[in-house]
Regions:
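Terminal, charged accessory segments of proteins
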Residues: 1-120
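Catalytic core segments in nucleotide and nucleic-acid processing enzymes
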Residues: 118-238
Length: 238
């Protein structure tokens, strides 16, 4: 399931987000994208509230990065030939005429331009983006613990003991349709059966029909606690 945009095609949106307005869709995409992007390629969240579509947001970010404000005459900034060639070609509308670069550009705007051009847009696997997002949030909240991925499950460990497991599930879950996560539920109970920890959370994107957790009980009544949890895609740590 892809999420992003491709030049000449337009935006590609997972069905779970298809009913959102432009601002909320952009806000969610930027939050997910920033978890997968390097520091210089991240997009400030303020761009989501501009009312622009995803492609326009990235082009606006490039234009803003290309502006040189209040240059200091007392400092000599490093000059990157590759970056200059890319930015000049972009500004003149002749990017296709730029020959292959022997070195990678250093300027953030040039890096974004090259990324957009090489991929004909920005489009990621939504499952991977969501998993990385959940991992980053858990690691930030539990900074004093060892947080790691193992077999598709995020574990938090302290003192050599697993405390809980979190399984990202990029599906449109509701109280009436939580069977869509049957595969993840089975894997969760299987992991709990090992006895190394007693709490498992299967997290899926929050939606209008999935705003409270769902407790899932095993038929035999044993095997630890397992919950389906609505996960908010936000820059906040909670």
């Amino acid at each position: 399931m892809k999420f992003g945009f491709l030049s000449g095609i337009g935006e590609i949106t997972p069905s779970i987000f298809s009913g959102l307005d432009a601002v909320n869709k952009a806000r969610i995409f930027i939050n997910l994208y920033n978890c997968c992007a390097g520091r210089e390629l991240k997009i400030p969240l303020i761009y989501a509230y501009s009312g622009l579509n995803l492609e326009e947001i990235f082009l606006k970010r490039i234009d803003d990065l290309c502006e040189f404000k209040n240059p200091s005459r007392s400092k000599i900034s490093s000059f990157c030939i590759a970056s200059n060639a890319v930015i000049c070609a972009y500004k003149s509308g002749k990017f296709d005429a730029v020959p292959p670069l022997a070195v990678s550009p250093k300027h953030p705007a040039a890096k974004l331009i090259v990324m957009l051009k090489s991929q004909n847009g920005i489009c990621f696997d939504a499952d991977i983006m969501f998993s990385q997002f959940v991992y980053d949030k858990i690691r930030a909240k539990h900074f004093d613990k060892n947080v790691y991925f193992q077999d598709g499950i995020i574990f938090a460990e302290q003192g050599g003991r697993k405390l809980f497991g979190v399984m990202p599930c990029f599906k449109e879950i509701t109280k009436e349709r939580f069977h869509l996560a049957n595969c993840e539920i089975a894997r969760g109970f299987e992991a709990l059966s090992g006895g190394e920890f007693d709490r498992m959370f299967i997290v899926a994107p929050r939606n209008a029909n999935f705003s409270r957790y769902i407790e899932v009980k095993r038929e035999c009544g044993r095997g630890g606690s397992l919950r389906l949890v609505p996960y908010t895609i936000s820059h906040h740590i909670f």
